[in-house]
């Protein structure tokens, strides 16, 4: 398994989604871990406590706030990415309420949130991390 070590592979964060920005990667790792444990919970207990879902959304909101702070500190443009965060939180909260109303299956919800998060990192966070790294290099 030497080849696997080429890119820092952590527990839940796929190597392809490592951004190189430690603060972000640590939080991404934590969020993937939470999603994973919710998937396990959903299968083992055949239920998904609503407070767990709200906790996950709160965790994402905190993570978004961290990224926004990193952008401000580095003076990196964040408008579109920030708008995406606002839109994402609105959609995720809507999905949670559909889950609560029984309109949405919990397994579908967890697959959706995991897929969405992977896409968001690939489409937004990797580019953002690269811009942060650039900004750090520039005096």
Where are these regions (language model features)?
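Small-residue-biased structural context
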Residues: 5-139
């Amino acid at each position: 398994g030497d080849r696997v070590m080429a890119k820092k592979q952590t527990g839940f964060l796929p190597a392809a989604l490592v951004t190189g920005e430690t603060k972000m990667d640590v939080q991404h790792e934590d969020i993937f871990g939470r999603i994973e444990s919710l998937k396990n919970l959903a299968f083992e207990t055949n239920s998904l406590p609503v407070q767990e879902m709200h906790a996950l959304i709160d965790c994402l909101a905190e993570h978004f706030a961290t990224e926004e702070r990193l952008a401000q500190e580095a003076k990196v443009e964040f408008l579109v990415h920030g708008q995406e965060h606002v839109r994402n939180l609105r959609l995720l909260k809507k999905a949670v309420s559909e889950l609560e109303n029984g309109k949405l299956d919990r397994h579908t919800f967890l697959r959706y949130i995991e897929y969405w998060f992977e896409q968001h990192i690939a489409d937004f966070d990797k580019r953002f991390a690269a811009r942060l790294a650039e900004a750090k290099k520039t005096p």
